[in-house]
Amino acid sequence: MGNNRFMVVSEERGIIAMNPSYIEQKGKNLIIYMPGTYKQLELEYKTEEEARSVFDDIRKAYESGKIDVYI
């Protein structure tokens, strides 16, 4: 996802991911890959549509240069 300053936060799950290297959607789950490691965070949503909506929010935030995305 580039070198922009970017953060993904899930207050419900206590997750913070600085500059995620890659994010993908698999069904009802979002997979957030951490930079410089083989670690990943998996967030599960109630529906695929909800997961898609959050994925789109993250993509739009990244493209617009926003700093934080709250999940």
What are these regions (language model features)?
Residues M1-I71:
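Eukaryotic intrinsically disordered, low-complexity regulatory linkers and tails enriched in Ser/Thr/Pro
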